């Protein structure tokens, strides 16, 4: 027996959205094949990103589930059932299962979601009553066979995003926690949106999602006017507005249902697979996800058109939707290969020319007399998209590819995990003293044992023991500290100091957004002095760097130790996650550390300054700091020790006799990006 649950959608019709044809096609393909791999829509505010995501949900057909099942299990597919359902209906024939039809779910993941809320946890109330751990489904369980929507994907916690995509890739959620082992299906259509102005999306996440497009394409005047008219009409009377598109929406719903059936019959030939792989190679894609996603997209396109065979246009569209946005070559296509020169004409060419023309005329006459044969559409495109003379692409595809290239290796700064301050990420088993108790997780851990504990202590309502206590794992964003260590001795000292000062001012202009801090330590004479403590203040930097000390000896050992101490103190503050030491020096220190610290050096003993420097470099590496050595001396006078110093610290060495503030700042940025 089947029960039908009524549902009246009020989402903006997808057919009423002006423009965005590539995105609408991608969403339709996702509706046909929810296991496609997900769709990401990038765009600024007001570009209908979330409107399109919700609009496609209206087109999804209702789903039949086992009546009362919390995981939307398909009664015809026992292979995808959760553990409880498999155990409960192990001996029940499929045709005797009681079912119901419900709307496909639409679940939105909030930005502050915890791991327990996403993946599921212990149901405290039921566990207390039953005396055993009972699983409470999370958001991923509720989204099975529906739409899982993430707004502002770029702002979602990295660990949460990785766990979410792992579950979607595997198609199931395996829970192993608090004395409980359980698995349930999770196969929704993933749709995510984000605004690039609020921060870039990590390339790692982008690589795990099938289709990524931009909604920032420029609309013409007529299209903008039409879009405004549509929005006003919908706001005035949503039901009347939707009624105008009922016929179109019904046609699309039918198309999706039929296409899902066609999809079961669609297959690719080996030649077509080779074409997609070749396009991925030409586009410079890393890994195999690109071509695998493109194969599923091509099959979904054929199914959408009501065909079981994949044609050349299907492959071309799949490349545009999947491979092009991933390409690293769109901004710099390879130069065209020069065609070989034509062979020289034979000496008797003129003599045989008339005879060849007569033969050609005879062939054309024969062709005219033959019946016209029907030509099948080609199964493989005649040219590659990643050719120098490539085909024209949809602006939304190209825009996203170029945007991803501009993004480069930039991304969110590091995060710091702690147990004292930050955003609550997940509960953890405490090691030692618990600074902040996770009350929710503690109660869940204690709930299965309440029944037995009350027998021992009938006068107490809730009994929590030491083994139930869970702590909070907290996370907060952290910036980077760039410590400029500048050799202020010698004739070129002033040039080095001016370049470092310019780099400091450049990086400080970007410091607020990234939470970065900058410090400057010149070393000259007998010791090194922290001229600019870690700061994000441009005003403070200008004031402190008005006078630049120069001349004297080169106490490089003391300078490196000062930089290490500044970095360690900054990390202890909890606001800094990465430390980069940029040493602008040739590596020729001539003042031992003991002398800089005021310690007595035994008479007749000569300190090994080189060994001292290498020991400090090893310490820098052990502390997880990055060392960049920039040698501004000319190559023919360089000792080469600066390179050895950088290698010992696991850092990088640059020979730049004419180092500029822009170049130094760029190297520091790259070092931070490499540490992420």
Curated annotation (Swiss-Prot):
The intrachain disulfides are none
> Which BP terms from GO are recorded?
chlorophyll biosynthetic process; photosynthesis
Tell me what this protein is called.
Magnesium-chelatase subunit ChlD
- The record's EC number reads 6.6.1.1
Q: Where is the composition biased (Pro residues)?
A: 332-347
Q: Which Pfam families match?
A: AAA_lid_2, Mg_chelatase, VWA_2
Q: What are the residue boundaries of the VWFA domain, all occurrences included?
A: 481-672
Enumerate the UniProt keywords alphabetically.
ATP-binding, Chlorophyll biosynthesis, Ligase, Nucleotide-binding, Photosynthesis
Q: Which organism is it from?
A: Synechocystis sp. (strain ATCC 27184 / PCC 6803 / Kazusa)
Family affiliation: Belongs to the Mg-chelatase subunits D/I family.
Q: Read off the PANTHER family from this record.
A: MAGNESIUM-CHELATASE SUBUNIT CHLD, CHLOROPLASTIC (PTHR43473:SF2)
Q: Where is the composition biased (Acidic residues)?
A: 352-375
Entry-linked SUPFAM superfamilies: P-loop containing nucleoside triphosphate hydrolases, vWA-like
Question: Which stretches of sequence are listed as region Disordered?
Answer: 328-387
InterPro entries hit by this protein: AAA+_ATPase, BchD/ChlD_VWA, ChlI/MoxR_AAA_lid, Mg_chelatase_ATPase-dsu, Mg_chelatse_chII-like_cat_dom, P-loop_NTPase, VWF_A, vWFA_dom_sf
Question: Where on the tree of life does the source sit, at the highest rank?
Answer: Bacteria
Q: State what this protein does.
A: Involved in chlorophyll biosynthesis; introduces a magnesium ion into protoporphyrin IX to yield Mg-protoporphyrin IX.
Which EC class is this protein assigned? ligase
Its pathway is: Porphyrin-containing compound metabolism; chlorophyll biosynthesis
């Amino acid at each position: 027996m089947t029960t039908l649950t009524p549902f009246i959608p009020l989402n903006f019709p997808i057919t009423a959205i002006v423009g965005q044809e590539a995105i609408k096609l991608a969403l339709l393909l996702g509706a046909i094949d929810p296991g496609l791999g997900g769709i990401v829509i990038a765009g600024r505010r007001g570009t209908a990103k979330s409107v399109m995501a919700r609009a496609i949900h209206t087109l999804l057909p209702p789903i039949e589930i086992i009546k009362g099942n919390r995981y939307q299990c398909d009664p015809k597919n026992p292979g995808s059932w959760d553990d409880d359902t498999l155990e409960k209906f192990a001996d029940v024939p499929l045709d005797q299962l009681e079912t119901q039809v419900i709307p496909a779910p639409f679940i939105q993941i909030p930005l502050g979601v915890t791991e327990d809320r996403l993946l599921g946890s212990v149901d405290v109330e039921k566990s207390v009553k039953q005396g055993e751990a009972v699983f409470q489904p999370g958001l991923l369980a509720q989204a099975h066979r529906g739409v899982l929507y993430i707004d502002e994907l770029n702002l979602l916690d990295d660990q949460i995003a990785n766990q979410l995509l792992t579950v979607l890739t595997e198609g199931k959620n395996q829970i192993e926690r608090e004395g409980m082992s359980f698995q349930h299906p999770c196969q929704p259509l993933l749709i995510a949106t984000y605004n690039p102005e609020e921060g870039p999306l990590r390339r790692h996440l982008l690589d795990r999602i099938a289709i990524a497009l931009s909604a920032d394409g420029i609309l013409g005047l007529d299209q903008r006017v039409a879009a405004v008219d549509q929005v006003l009409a919908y706001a005035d009377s949503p039901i009347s507005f939707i009624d105008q598109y009922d016929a179109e929406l019904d046609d699309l719903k039918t198309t999706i249902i039929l296409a899902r059936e066609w999809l079961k019959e669609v297959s690719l030939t080996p030649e077509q697979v080779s074409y997609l792989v070749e396009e991925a190679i030409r586009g410079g894609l890393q890994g195999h996800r690109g071509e695998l996603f493109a194969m599923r997209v091509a099959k979904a396109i054929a199914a959408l058109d009501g065909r079981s065979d994949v044609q050349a246009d299907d492959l071309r569209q799949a490349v545009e939707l999947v491979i092009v946005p991933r390409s690293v070559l769109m901004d710099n296509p390879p130069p065209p290969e020069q065609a070989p020169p034509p062979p020289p004409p034979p000496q008797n060419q003129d003599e045989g020319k008339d005879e060849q023309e007569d033969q050609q005329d005879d062939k054309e006459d024969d062709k005219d007399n033959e019946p016209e044969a029907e030509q099948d559409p080609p199964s493989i495109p005649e040219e590659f998209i990643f050719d120098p003379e490539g085909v024209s692409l949809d602006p939304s595809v190209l825009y996203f590819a170029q945007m991803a290239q501009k993004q480069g290796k930039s991304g969110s700064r590091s995060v710091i995990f702690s147990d004292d301050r930050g955003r609550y990420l997940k509960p953890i088993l405490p090691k030692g003293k618990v600074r902040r108790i996770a009350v929710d997780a503690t109660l869940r851990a204690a709930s299965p044992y309440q029944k037995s504990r009350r027998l021992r202590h009938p006068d107490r309502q809730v009994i929590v023991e030491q083994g139930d206590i869970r702590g909070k794992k907290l996370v907060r964003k952290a910036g980077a500290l760039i410590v400029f260590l500048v050799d202020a001795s010698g004739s070129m000292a002033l040039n080095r100091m001016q370049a470092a000062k310019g780099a400091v001012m450049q990086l400080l202009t970007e410091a607020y957004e990234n939470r970065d801090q900058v410090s400057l330590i010149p070393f000259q004479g007998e010791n090194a002095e922290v001229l600019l403590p870690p700061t994000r203040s441009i005003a403070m930097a200008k004031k402190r760097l008005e006078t630049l000390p120069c001349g004297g000896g080169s106490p490089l050992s003391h300078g490196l130790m000062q930089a290490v101490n500044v970095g360690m103190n900054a990390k202890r503050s909890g606001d800094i996650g990465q430390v980069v030491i940029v040493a602008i020096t040739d590596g020729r220190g001539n003042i031992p550390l003991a002398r800089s610290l005021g310690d007595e050096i035994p008479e007749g003993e000569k300190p090994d300054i080189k060994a001292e420097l290498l020991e400090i470099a090893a310490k820098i590496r052990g502390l997880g700091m990055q060392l960049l050595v920039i040698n501004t001396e000319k190559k023919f006078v360089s000792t080469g020790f600066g390179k050895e110093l950088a290698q010992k610290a696991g850092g990088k060495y640059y020979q730049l006799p004419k180092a500029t503030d822009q170049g130094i700042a760029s190297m520091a940025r790259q070092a931070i990006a490499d540490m992420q």
